[in-house]
Amino acid sequence: VTPEEWHFLTRLDVSGLALLPRGDGGTREGLVQVVPTLMLDGGAEFGVNLEAPVRLRLWGGERYAGVIHQEDWDSLSDWGQVIRALKLGSNEAPLALWMGALDSYSLLSGHLVRRYSNRINPDYHPAGGFLTGTLGPLYVEAFASDVLGARLFGAEAEVDLEHVLFGRSVQAGRYTLAVSAVHEGGRGEGTSPEITLAHLDGTAVVWARSSFELHLLAGWGGRPGTGGAWGAVAGVGADAETPSLNARLRLEARRQHGGFRQGAFGPDYELARFRAAGASRQPLAEAPFPEGASVYAEADVGWDAERLVGRMQRHLSFSWAVEVFTSRRVDTDGRIALQLFERNLELALSVLGVGLGRPGARYLVAGELRWRFASRLYALGRGGTPLFPQTDGSLRPGAQASLGVGVDNAR
């Protein structure tokens, strides 16, 4: 990378933040939030985004609470929030590392870890990471939800069968077999029961063109050491990619038995590890899950009227998943983001619903607005309905809203 290819950005956001209780319990708090940010882009092989969010209490909160909102920095894992993103190595490199906030992360096939976010707990701010490596026909991805804590970690190894049997082919990864395992250590911001899940997957690409691919998939998984806990899956997926469009679609039929389910480490897992959605009031590792079948559908679309650049330049980002169970339960989560008026206005809305249609359903909503009204100045607003884990394992519902301004050297 030549010096001319290096780019940097500095940013400072200052906003007022209100934390409000919903229902019984909790206290009202007013804070000032200051977020300095430094980004350095070294091209495809290197990038880093550092930030140090600090929230200062103006009013409210627990008795004898200090000026600094201590929940933001009360554990070793919370220091991981300084690393928003760190990239070493490109997607094509034989070895690459990524660290930071995991947002809608899936571990390869996604049948164990799917659309997982490690910072959905508002008082827990870890840095996660994943390492990818390629050696001949073998591709491996290993991940950790918290590089500073004994939390969720696992890996998936994928073998290119055509490469093994007939040598390197023009189209790599056409027929693959993969095995994955994920373990919850249960230690971090609070403790939760340990759990280990494993899965075997096979994929076959049945139609491929320069910008389109159609594949079939099937798999089987279980909970090692627990008899009768297993699940099976079969489905179809499609990927399309052009300079202005990137789309991934998936449709699956699933079977659950003995408490096992695909995608157990999903979008609400950092809350479910303390209390799963539903009437059981137990952690996910111990909560019963009804036997039956389900249909799972997922769409992930990015579009730009000019050209897709990285993950940031998109006039439209749309990601949604829904799973409908024979037990009359529905799980869904999604996010839509828009860039309008020459990208001066950015809007985003996220929705999460778990256990819909059954007692103890869980709902989360979050929205964000960013309006650039001058070359280096912008206004920003955020709001949402977070759930705060308590020492007894319960989840206290809350609401938050913030409004502020920021300055950067992006333009």
Description of each model-found segment:
Residues 1-25, 35-47:
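N-terminal periplasmic/intermembrane-space "pro-region" immediately following the signal or transit peptide
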Residues 347-349, 366-411:
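Extended, charged low-complexity segments
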Residues 43, 209, 341, 372-374:
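Residue-level recognition of beta-strand termini and adjacent short loop/turns
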Residues 87-90, 96-107, 126:
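Hydrophobic alpha-helical hairpins/lids featuring a short glycine-rich hinge
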Residues 3-9, 16, 27-29, 61, ...:
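Signature for the C-terminal beta-barrel architecture of outer-membrane proteins
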Residues 26-28, 42-85, 112:
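Surface-exposed loop and membrane-interface regions of Gram-negative outer-membrane beta-barrel proteins
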Residues 81-93, 233-241, 368:
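Short aromatic-glycine motifs in intrinsically disordered, low-complexity regions
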Residues 52-54, 92, 101-103, 146:
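A mature extracytoplasmic/lumenal domain signature
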